[in-house]
Swiss-Prot record:
UniProt keyword annotations, A-Z: Aromatic hydrocarbons catabolism, Dioxygenase, Iron, Metal-binding, Oxidoreductase, Repeat
Protein name as catalogued: Biphenyl-2,3-diol 1,2-dioxygenase
NCBIfam families for the chain: 23dbph12diox
PROSITE patterns per record: EXTRADIOL_DIOXYGENAS, VOC
GO biological process: xenobiotic catabolic process
Record keyword Iron present: yes
Keyword Acyltransferase assigned: no
Matches recorded under Pfam families: BphC_D1, Glyoxalase
Cofactor dependency: Fe(2+)
Lineage, top ranks: Bacteria, Pseudomonadati, Pseudomonadota, Gammaproteobacteria, Pseudomonadales
Residue ranges with Basic and acidic residues bias: 287-303
Name of the top EC class for this enzyme: oxidoreductase
Ranges where the record places region Disordered: 283-303
Amino acid sequence: MSIRSLGYMGFAVSDVAAWRSFLTQKLGLMEAGTTDNGDLFRIDSRAWRIAVQQGEVDDLAFAGYEVADAAGLAQMADKLKQAGIAVTTGDASLARRRGVTGLITFADPFGLPLEIYYGASEVFEKPFLPGAAVSGFLTGEQGLGHFVRCVPDSDKALAFYTDVLGFQLSDVIDMKMGPDVTVPVYFLHCNERHHTLAIAAFPLPKRIHHFMLEVASLDDVGFAFDRVDADGLITSTLGRHTNDHMVSFYASTPSGVEVEYGWSARTVDRSWVVVRHDSPSMWGHKSVRDKALRATKHEQQPE
C-alpha cells in the first residue's frame, strides 16, 4: 500500500511552444493533445506523462506519485495527516484533468505541490508514436523517471520523503562544489529504479536541478545527443554515473531546468546495500553549461 512510482510531472513555463518543440523534436516524446491540464506528452501507453502549462515560474509545477488502488490512496492520506501534513482530496474536476480515478494533493516541506493518485488512463489502442527517432522509453513498474529536488535543508526533506512517503535510501554522492564545499546528494527509490528522487541542498533558484528520462538503447541516447547538440543545448557531455551506472547526457530545457537523457541504469533489489560515492561519474559528464545557457538565452530573445 505504498507509493509505486513517479507517474507524471507538470511544468509551468513562459514558452509552451519552445517546450513542445524540445520535447518532441529533440527528446522524442509524443504530443497527446491540449486540455485544461496543459499541453500533454506521452512516452508510453499512459495517456500522458508530462504536462506543460503557461506560467512565469519556468519550473516544475507539480508531480504525481502512483499507488495501486483506492485503499493505497487512503492509507497514504492517513499517513500524511498523522505527520501533520495538510491533505486535500482532489475533486472530480481535478481527477478528470489528470486522467485518474482518485487523488490527493499536498506539498513537501519546501512548497513543491505533490499529488498521489490511482487509476491512471491507459491508451493501448493509440500506439505510441515518438516525435523523433526513439525506439522506446523505460517506464512500466519503474515509472516515468526521476527528478532531483533542490532544497535549503536536505535533512528535513530526507525525513519527509523517507519517513512519511516511504522512499528508501539507495546511496549518497558527496558532490564537490568547490575547494572547501561538499554537498551530499541523497538518492531514493520506491521501486527497482535506482532512484525516483534525489535530494540536495543545491543553491539553485529552481525547485529541481533536472528530470530524467530513460530510453531503450544506447543509439537512442546518441541520436538524441546529436539532435540537442545541433542547437547548442548540451550542458554535460556523455558520461556514466558511479551510482546507477547510467550512460547519459544533460541538456537545458527552454526554461533552464535541465533534463538527463540516459540508458542502461542498474536496478535495486533485496540484495542492495547503501553505499557512498565521492564522485558522480566514472567518466564523462564534463560541464559545457555556459555554452548551453548562451544558446537558451539566444532562443528567448524577441525577434
